[in-house]
Amino acid sequence: MADSEDGDHVATTTTEQRYDDDGHLVPSSGGQEEEGSGGRDVVVPGGHVAEDYRSGVGVPVGRDAGGATSSPPQPVHVTPSILVGSIHAPVFQGELVGMKFGVGSGSMGAGTSATRRLPATGFGALPTSSMAEDSADHADDDHLAEEEEEEEEEHYIDDGPLVPSSGGQEEEGSGGRHVFVPGGHDGEEDHPDDLVADLDLDLLVDGVVGPVPGGHLNADAPAFVPTTRGRQDLYSALSSSAPAAGYRYRHYITSSALAEAGHVSPFLGLPYATAFDSPLDRELVGPSSAPPPCSAASRAWLVRCSSPLSDSEWTRRSILAREAAHTPASTVTGRGRFEFVPIPGAPYAPPPSFAPIAAGAGPAARPLQQLAFGLEEHKTKLCAEYYSRGLGCPRGNTCKYAHGEDDLRLVVAVSSLADAGEGSSSSDSSFAALGGEDKYKTKLCKTFTSGGLCLFAANCRFAHGEVELGKKEPCWYFFSGQTCPRGDTCGFRHSY
């Protein structure tokens, strides 16, 4: 029926409403308003928002692009109902109640400010008692499957709901629908990263896995707390848990030994260091042959813990063990410090003195007498090889024969002087008796002063420079067969 009035007259057009066999309203042409049985004007396909004139509240409604449904609508067996988009919205007592519409990234309840994906059994259901009785028998499974296929992307925070987008604007869902989210924020979803790996300490120590920043460490044993018998208890625990050498602390690493920022690199801070006088033996501190850490971020190793106290204790025990293996037990004690047991009759002799040689002078005179008789023929004859080889002797300075007339010496047997009872209280008299001492180092060496290399070196009887002039006193180190620590700078004579 249609009433029209020109000017002051209002034209009212009433169209015929058509219902199907189940009592559902059949939509008319796209874009026009249809009056439902509840007295509400609802935008049918081609429209966007259904307004409730009584409450004045706009209800957000899902909308297919272009206003067309991808499949024939499947009726929900409730009478009456209104087809909105592709959802059948039942009407009770003249009002549209509790609709939930399927949208691109989930489902949205009417009047809410966030969307959440609903389980399949509750999709499109109405939170009313009358609807609950029929929802189990009249669920639209085909429609649910089609809606889920259209969903291509879902953004959730850690507990599932979609993060709202920018306030008041329309966001395009993956299912081809525009979603109006009141009070949301723009665009990017928050993804708090609480899904971090659980790290096992044994795997980290063995290098099987690498440390993950922020990872949760699975420590399957309590931290070690020093007690009165803590050292013995820890020693027993390690001995029973580690069958071979190279022990590793797998269950006695405290959380304080882990580095910051999630980089797990357990260094051994020994908790018992302050409770005892000395730590355990070094072989229990760490693997003796373990390689050094490759990288603090790639592999975590146990490292050797060393301190002055532990080093000294370990050294003391090592020396005691080695000494006990090679020395009688009476000479090594283990009372916490070393005790050096004096050996009876230890050889100790003072440097020999150049005392006068006399008959029956005793043991002190014998070395000097033997030295004097050994030097009886030293440098008293010319070296034949020295002249035959063109002034070159293979023995060099060690040759007992004189290499030239300047090298000749006059040696007088000491025994004859001793038998005669001659001598003086000074050491000069005994060596002066060897002959030629009045000329020793009193003149400069011609070879040395000419810039040549003297083959006699320190044994040359002539002075090599002004410093050696007047060196008449014999060097004790040289004549006793030892090396003089002063070398050529010695103020005493290094020559026979």
Swiss-Prot record:
A zinc finger (C3H1-type) spans 377-406, 439-467, 469-496. Keywords: DNA-binding, Metal-binding, Repeat, Zinc, Zinc-finger. It holds the Pfam family zf-CCCH. The keyword Zinc-finger applies. Disulfide bonds: none annotated. InterPro entries: ZFP36-like (IPR045877), Znf_CCCH (IPR000571), Znf_CCCH_sf (IPR036855). The keyword Cell cycle does not apply. Residues 1-77, 108-194 are annotated as: Disordered. Gene3D superfamilies: Zinc finger, CCCH-type. Residues 143-156 have a biased composition (Acidic residues). Signal peptide: none annotated. GO terms for molecular function: DNA binding; mRNA binding; zinc ion binding. This is Putative zinc finger CCCH domain-containing protein 48. It comes from Oryza sativa subsp. japonica (Rice).
